């Protein structure tokens, strides 16, 4: 199965951010905007896209999606662009058992711990900027930042996956699916009876 590593860069400001809101509230807010996405297929070249119609043209038929904090990137991938991979992978979830109480599970901390490279800081300069607000030079720097994040995530996955139990990967996938692609099963008979009760009470 092919591994598609992704990282979305999105608009945020001092009030509208993941530090102030839940992931779901942030993604469903009317202020949400994708600036761009970096995509790497297996160990191929990582590419940056600002046009989402072009971004997903070359996805393999049989693939899994890898990200660092897949709850966020995976939800954008599924909710906004209706893409459905066969499997979800998440380096943050993979790192938690070993690093949550020590190194921490940020991509920056883990990259430093495993000597994979350095995570950039360009995201700190993008606060309050819509895509239209970026100069070409700023957007180029942001693209390089995003591409680097994808490269670090893929390298981290290669480190963490050595000896990582398949059963645990399946638990991670199932846990992510409960958020990214939730399924609600309704009791039709109970709802019909409840509706009848409401109608009856209104008539009295």
Identify what each model region corresponds to.
Residues 2-4, 13-20, 28-159:
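Conserved DEDDh/DEDDy metal-dependent 3′-5′ exonuclease domain
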């Amino acid at each position: 199965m092919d591994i598609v590593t992704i990282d979305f860069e999105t608009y945020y400001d001092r009030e509208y951010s993941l530090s102030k809101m839940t992931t779901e509230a942030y993604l469903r807010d009317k202020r949400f905007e994708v600036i761009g996405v970096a995509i790497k297929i297996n160990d191929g070249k990582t590419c940056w896209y600002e046009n989402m119609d072009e971004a997903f043209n070359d996805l393999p038929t049989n693939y899994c999606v890898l990200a660092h904090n897949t709850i966020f990137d995976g939800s954008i991938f599924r909710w906004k662009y209706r893409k459905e991979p066969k499997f979800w992978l998440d380096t943050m979830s993979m790192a938690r058992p070993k690093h949550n109480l020590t190194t921490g599970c940020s991509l920056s901390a883990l990259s430093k711990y495993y000597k994979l490279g350095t995570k950039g800081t360009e995201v700190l300069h993008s606060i309050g900027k819509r895509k239209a607000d970026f100069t070409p030079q700023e957007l180029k720097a942001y693209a390089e930042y995003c591409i680097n994040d994808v490269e670090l995530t893929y390298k981290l996955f290669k480190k963490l996956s050595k000896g990582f139990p398949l059963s645990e990967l399946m638990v991670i996938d199932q846990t992510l699916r409960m958020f990214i692609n939730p399924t609600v099963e309704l009791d039709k008979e109970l709802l019909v009876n409840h509706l009848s009760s409401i109608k009856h009470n209104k008539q009295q």
